[in-house]
Amino acid sequence: MHRAAVFLSVLVAALALVGGASAAVRVGVADDFGVDVLNGPWFLDQIGELGMTENRVSVGFDAASPTTIQNQAALDLYVPLATLRGVRLVFSVAPAKAKGITDTPGAAGLFAQYVALLARTYPTVKDFIIGNEPNQPRFWQPQFGRGGQNVSSGAYYELLAAAYDALKAVDPSINVIGLGLSPRGGDKPNAPNNVSTSPVRFLHGLGKAYRASGRSRPIMDELAFHPYPDQDRDPLLKGYRWPNAGVPNLDRVKQAFWDAFYGTAQPVFPEGTSSNGLKFRLDELGWQVDVLPSAAYAYFGLETVSPTNESAQAGIYADAVRYLACDASVNSVLFFLLRDEPNLERWQAGLVRADGSRRPSFDTVKSAIAESGGRCPGAMRAWRHSTRVAGAKVRWPRKLRLPARRLALALVLNAEEDARFEAGLYNARGKRVLRQAGSVDAYRSRIVRFSSRFRPGRYTFRVTLKAALNAGRRSSFSAPLRITR
C-alpha cells in the first residue's frame, strides 16, 4: 500500500473540515518551500499563525517520464502533514518545459493520465490547477502560428479538456481549475521578446476552440488568475487597460469569459447576488519589495525591477484581503510567495524575508484575516454581463445645422476595447446616402469623415459599434443633421 494512504482514515475527517468552508474567501500562499521535509513544520507553523488555510504547490510534468510523479518522496510526507494541520492543498500541474506539450505527439493524453495518477495517489487533494500562465512564452510555446494567429489557446484547450475528463473519472468531486492566466500579454506575434497573449484574447481563443470542438460538458470548475500589478509601485486598484487585467479589472475577465462561453455547457461567472457559476482561484498575487540593509546578507545577485517598500506592501496586502472578500466570485486569494527567494533576479514579495524575519505585511495580513474571517467588511460587489461595447462614445460635428454646399463632416469614435463600426448618413425617407465602416482600436480616437455635396433637408447620423471579440455586444448612436439652403 502506498505510504501516503496509511493516513487516509484520519485525513478524511480533517479534509471534511477543510473542504466544508463557507462562502468566506480562503487566504493562503502559493509556495513550494514547505514541501521540503526540512522546511515543512516551520512553513506550516507560519501559515497557521497567519490564519491561512490554503497552500498551492507545483507538481511538474515531464513527457519523457509521464508515469513518474515528480518530487514524489517529498509530496508523500508533505500532503498528509499539511492536511492534518487543516491546510487545503492545491496541486498546480504544468509541463516542465514551454514546449513540453506541443513538441510531443500525444502529450495532452499523457498529461491527462498523469493528473489522474496524482489524484489516485493523493486522494485528499481535491483541487487541481491545469497548467500555468499558458498565455506566456516562458510557460507555453508557441503562442502564435506563422500567419500571426494565436495557437496557444487552442493547444491548451486540448490539454484542459483531456485533464478535466481524466480527473472527473477518478473523482467527480475534484475541482478542475483552468488556466492560471498571467494578467498581461502583448498580442504581438512579431515582437522582439515576450511574444505573449493578453488574458482577454486568450479566453476568446479558448472559447473558439471549445465551440469548434462540439464539446457538451465543461472544461473547468474554477478559473485561476494571477492579478499582479503592472509595476510593483502601483497601488492595489490601479489595474490595466483592456485587454489586460489586474485586481480592479476582474469584471473584465468575467465579461471575456461570458463572451467566450455563454450558451455552452461551460458555466460562466455568477451575476448579481447569485453564487452559482464559475469562481476565481486567484492563486498568485504579490508586490515585490526592496531589501532592508539588515537582511541584505541573506540575498545575492542584482535586482531586476523597481520594487515598492515594505510599508506599502503591508497596506496593499491587507487591503487585498478585504477588497477581494467582497467579490462573491472569488474562492481564494494566494500570495506568491510566503518567503523570499534569496536570488534578487527572482522573486521577493514574501511576507517573510529570506533570512526568516517577518515583514510588516505578515502582521497586517494576519490582522486582516482575523478581523474579517475572509468575509466582506462592507457591501458585496455585483457583476452583470454587458451587452454593449465598453466605453463606446461618439463625438459629433460641432455644428449640426449647416448651409448647403460641399462639406467634409467628421465624427470621432472611441471605445475602451477593440471594436468594429458602421457609420451612415440617412435622409428624411430613411435611405442611406453615405456609409463608412472600419475598426476602432481601444483607447484611440477613430476619425470618420464624410465628404459630399449635400442637398438641403433633414438627415440622421447613425453609428453602430460592435465588440471585436463578440459582435453580439453593440452600442448604437444617432444624431440629427440639418442642411439649409
Model-derived regions: residue spans:
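Noncatalytic carbohydrate-binding groove/subsite architecture in carbohydrate-active enzymes
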Residues: 41, 107-112, 151-310
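Substrate-binding cleft and catalytic face of glycoside hydrolase catalytic domains
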Residues: 47-193, 230, 339-341
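Aromatic/hydrophobic beta-strand junction motif of beta-rich domains
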Residues: 407-415
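Bacterial N-terminal signal peptides
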Residues: 7-16
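Aromatic-rich peripheral "rim/lid" segments of glycoside hydrolase catalytic domains that contact
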Residues: 38, 66, 134, 138-139, ...
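A glycine-anchored, Pro-Gly-centered beta-turn/N-cap motif
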Residues: 444, 450, 455-459
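Boundary/entry segment of secreted carbohydrate-active catalytic domains
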Residues: 23-60
